[in-house]
C-alpha cells in the first residue's frame, strides 16, 4: 500500500471511531424492498423509529429493527451510558446491493428463464441532534 493511501485509510478509520453505526450484510431480500423500509425511518428519533418498525407489516422491518437496536447498543457502549429518550436520531441509513445468486427456471419450448435472487447490505448510523444538523 502506498503512503498516501495508507494515510487516507488511517484518517477514515479514525473518523469511524467517532461515529456510531451498525451494519447488516447479505440480507436475502432485494435492495428495493429494503429501501422502502429504510426510507420510513430516515432522520427519525430512535424510539419513534423502533415503534414504526415494530408495527410495520413488511418483512424487512424486523431486520432493520434489530439493526437499529444494535446501533443504539453500540452508541451506549462507546459513551458508557444509557441513551435517553429524544437524544438519539437515525442520522444516516443506506442500502447497497449485495451478491446476486443466478438461477434458471424451466420455461416453455425448452427455454430457460433466469431468476436473480438478490441480497443487500444495510448500514445505519445513529447520533445526537447536533451531529445530525452538522452533517446536513
Swiss-Prot record:
This protein's GO CC annotations: cytosolic large ribosomal subunit
SUPFAM superfamilies per UniProt: Ribosomal protein L22
Coiled-coil segments on the chain, per record: none
One of the protein's GO biological processes: translation
Molecular function (Gene Ontology), one example: structural constituent of ribosome
Disulfide bonds: none
Keywords, comma-separated and alphabetical: Ribonucleoprotein, Ribosomal protein, RNA-binding, rRNA-binding
A family per Pfam: Ribosomal_L22
Domain of life: Bacteria
Protein role: This protein binds specifically to 23S rRNA; its binding is stimulated by other ribosomal proteins, e.g. L4, L17, and L20. It is important during the early stages of 50S assembly. It makes multiple contacts with different domains of the 23S rRNA in the assembled 50S subunit and ribosome. The globular domain of the protein is located near the polypeptide exit tunnel on the outside of the subunit, while an extended beta-hairpin is found that lines the wall of the exit tunnel in the center of the 70S ribosome.
Oligomer and partners: Part of the 50S ribosomal subunit.
Stated family: Belongs to the universal ribosomal protein uL22 family.
NCBIfam families in UniProt: rplV_bact
Name of protein: Large ribosomal subunit protein uL22
Annotated source species: Bacteroides thetaiotaomicron (strain ATCC 29148 / DSM 2079 / JCM 5827 / CCUG 10774 / NCTC 10582 / VPI-5482 / E50)
Lineage: Bacteria, Pseudomonadati, Bacteroidota, Bacteroidia, Bacteroidales
Amino acid at each position: 500500500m502506498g503512503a498516501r493511501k495508507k494515510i487516507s485509510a488511517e484518517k477514515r478509520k479514525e473518523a469511524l471511531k467517532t461515529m456510531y453505526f451498525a451494519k447488516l450484510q447479505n440480507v436475502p431480500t432485494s435492495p428495493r424492498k429494503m429501501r422502502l423500509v429504510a426510507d420510513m425511518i430516515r432522520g427519525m428519533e430512535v424510539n419513534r423509529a423502533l415503534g414504526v418498525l415494530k408495527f410495520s407489516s413488511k418483512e424487512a422491518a424486523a431486520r432493520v429493527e434489530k439493526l437499529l437496536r444494535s446501533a443504539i447498543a453500540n452508541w451506549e457502549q462507546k459513551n458508557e451510558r444509557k441513551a435517553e429518550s429524544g437524544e438519539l436520531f437515525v442520522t444516516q441509513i443506506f442500502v447497497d446491493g449485495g451478491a446476486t445468486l443466478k438461477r434458471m427456471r424451466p420455461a416453455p419450448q425448452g427455454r430457460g428463464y433466469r431468476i436473480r435472487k438478490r441480497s443487500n447490505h444495510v448500514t445505519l448510523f445513529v447520533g445526537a441532534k447536533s451531529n445530525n444538523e452538522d452533517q446536513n
